[in-house]
Swiss-Prot record:
This is Large ribosomal subunit protein uL14. SUPFAM superfamilies: Ribosomal protein L14 (SSF50193). It comes from Gemmatimonas aurantiaca (strain DSM 14586 / JCM 11422 / NBRC 100505 / T-27). Belongs to the universal ribosomal protein uL14 family. GO terms for molecular function: large ribosomal subunit rRNA binding; structural constituent of ribosome. The gene is rplN. The keyword Transmembrane does not apply. GO terms for biological process: translation.
Length: 122
């Protein structure tokens, strides 16, 4: 569960390292974001030669959460960290690589480019 003011890791090579969630997209009263949900983030830590800079505002999709997520078969999936991938307005990643595993829920939410770039899908 990711909410406003959550600090998340950026799991791609866009240049950002840490980001602050400033809005959960999907309705005016939406409080929490889970796997595959879109958020708006402000970059807090960035590499000097990356495509995104510190204090940039960007859209992102949640790829890992510490809070467990229940699947239809009754199993649960959870990760060691909260992580996002920065995307453009079309839902495609700005980066060319993705670090760490991503959840299978991204395939169900039609983020095929992120799933194909990921080294592992759990």
């Amino acid at each position: 569960m990711i909410q406003q003011e959550s600090v998340v890791k950026v799991a791609d090579n866009s240049g950002a390292k840490r980001a602050l969630v400033i809005r959960v997209l999907g309705g005016t009263r939406r409080r929490y974001a889970g796997l595959g949900d879109r958020v708006i983030v402000a970059v807090k830590d960035a590499l000097p030669n990356g495509t995104v800079k510190k204090s940039d505002v960007a859209k992102a999709v949640v790829v890992r959460t510490v809070k467990e997520t229940r699947r239809k078969d009754g199993s649960y999936i959870r990760f060691d960290e909260n992580a996002v991938v920065i995307i453009n307005d079309n839902g495609e990643p700005k980066a060319t690589r993705i670090f760490g595993p991503v959840a299978r829920e991204l395939r169900e939410k039609r983020y095929m480019k992120i799933v194909s770039l990921a080294p592992e899908v759990l």
